[in-house]
Every structure is written in structure tokens, then in C-alpha cells.
Amino acid sequence: MTMADVKQANKDAGYYFFSRDTMRFFGTRIVSALYKNNTFITSDYTDFERNNRAYSVRVFHPETGIVNTAKFSDGKSTFNKFSTIESAREFARNYKAA
């Protein structure tokens, strides 16, 4: 499965994660391919001034088309928690849903 497939599945399920307006509002950029565990990495603005960016690990659920943000083992969100692409990649590659 490719990111194009993920985008289409999300849209077909009636969701807007990848819509132009949604991505523009959050300043979201997709910065990785889809990993085997259905995760991928985004870069988003960390503030409304749009000066800083951080990385988040996202999870695609093929059975529903939903995309959500991965969680750490303590249940906290990974949204904008990675300051480097390398740290986000390591987490994404090793992610196992709870």
C-alpha cells in the first residue's frame, strides 16, 4: 500500500485528514512513506506564527480509513513530540499498537 492509497481510502471513508484545507491549516507535510506497520510521519507547525516544526507519527487503519496519531506506551500522544526526523523514524519503525 502506498501513501496515495492511504489518502484515497481516508477520503473514500469520508474523512479529511489529507484534504488541502486541513493540511494547510496545520501546516502538515507528509515526510515518509507508509511503513509496514501502517505508520507514517508528518511534520507540522508547532505554533500559530508558523516558525517552528516538529514531527508526529501517524497510524493508518485500513479497515476504517481513519488516520490518528500514534501514542507512546504511557498513552500520551506523539503529536509534535519529535524534534528530529531520525527520532520519529525510529519510533515509527518500531511502533506496535496497544
Predicted regions and their residues:
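A short, charged, amphipathic alpha-helix used as a generic interaction element across diverse proteins
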Residues: 70-98
